[in-house]
Amino acid sequence: MKTTAAMLWEKLRDGSVEQRAIEFAKTTLPYLMVDPMSGSRGVVEHDFQSAGALLVNNLAAKLARSLFPTGIPFFRSELTDAIRREADSRDTDITEVTAALARVDRKATQRLFQNASLAVLTQVIKLLIVTGNALLYRDSDAATVVAWSLRSYAVRRDATGRWMDIVLKQRYKSKDLDEEYKQDLMRAGRNLSGSGSVDLYTHVQRKKGTAMEYAELYHEIDGVRVGKEGRWPIHLCPYIVPTWNLAPGEHYGRGHVEDYIGDFAKLSLLSEKLGLYELESLEVLNLVDEAKGAVVDDYQDAEMGDYVPGGAEAVRAYERGDYNKMAAIQQSLQAVVVRLNQAFMYGANQRDAERVTAEEVRITAEEAENTLGGTYSLLAENLQSPLAYVCLSEVDDALLQGLITKQHKPAIETGLPALSRSAAVQSMLNASQVIAGLAPIAQLDPRISLPKMMDTIWAAFSVDTSQFYKSADELQAEAEQQRQQAAQAQAAQETLLEGASDMTNALAGV
């Protein structure tokens, strides 16, 4: 029996993973896991606290600004050996090639940010933080990005964590289907009801080719393949399945919220109980002492100014609740919130602006790497890099062949690479300060070689000086130029002296 996409969907789904994701979303952003198959506005069950939503929104916004900063390309096309050889064969200046690559990078980045795609990427980051999983699709024709939660897709991975199968399930009204899909269904003998709904399955499978791996796609409705099929090199596949943290051997990732679910559970439970206790404490009961002549019915039915039996102390108000107990609970909640604030980078170290500086991006990247560990590095590999390849393929068809063979490769510029560049510059500054302090020693002791001392200091600070030192040919050319300048200066001096001598002789003859 042939395995259909619907059968594969049921096989690859993991109900326990989906249920855990729903619980994690409930304590933070419940709408992330709303069932898209409901066909209407889904019912969202909210928690008794909103701190989780605040923390996730804050962390997602920071990561989005750091990973995809507006106005700054998040990747840079590498000047590979293949590109250098091509430039040499065409006798093209390498600086012109570098400038052209930079223009391509900017154009690709600008295209990514069209049609509110940054908002969708922020949504993807929220899904990763809360559930650990997300599926996004880059539509190159429309220049848009679409994202789905675990409710809409299933995935299978191999032992190394590479995805092998992706099955996306979407529900459409029959009347909203593409005409091409309708024609394919009619040819297969399937009748569509105008008011009914159908499930559209999209299956993306990783396959091995003779030269490289590729992704193959087809659509299916009711066991019938519909529409056009697709095929891309695996690194140019527009379907991307990033994870927040993927354990070896697992098909689905784990989110940041799961690491702190204990604190979120305590925050939720105490917030609920404290809220109910505070409401109860607002109620006031009147205690009536009938031994002192007071009658409950008399006080219950009395109007203002009525005369009733009793004494001044026969009735007293009683308020429920204990202030000290509520203060202790609030203090415990505050301790939980402080821990979560630190874990979710809740602080005001970056301006809330449309454009941020490169230094602010670097600071956020450093804080994220220190707080989130290797997860931040993982996002560059399974989210940024695939998007960079796809966006570059949209800019210029001439780049496509180079992208397919990976002769044209994008290098991620934000995140950890920004930290590495900053660390390299800081090492150079530190080494320069040490050299400036030790340089006078070479003047005091003629036995000391200043270049050798500088080489030792550069090496101690792990500074690669090969990219700064002049080549032997450059040094020889400069020496030759200096000799020519010296010869010209000598000739000019001799000419000046001869002219002065002639003038002196002429004056003496007068």
Swiss-Prot record:
Disulfide bonds: none annotated. InterPro entries: Connector_podovirus. It is found in: Virion. The keyword Signal does not apply. Forms the portal vertex of the capsid. This portal plays critical roles in head assembly, genome packaging, neck/tail attachment, and genome ejection. The portal protein multimerizes as a single ring-shaped homododecamer arranged around a central channel. One of its GO terms (cellular component) is viral capsid. It comes from the Viruses. GO terms for biological process: symbiont genome ejection through host cell envelope, short tail mechanism. Belongs to the podoviridae head-to-tail connector protein family. This is Portal protein. The keyword Transcription regulation does not apply. Keywords: Capsid protein, Viral capsid assembly, Viral genome ejection through host cell envelope, Viral genome packaging, Viral penetration into host cytoplasm, Viral release from host cell, Viral short tail ejection system, Virion, Virus entry into host cell.
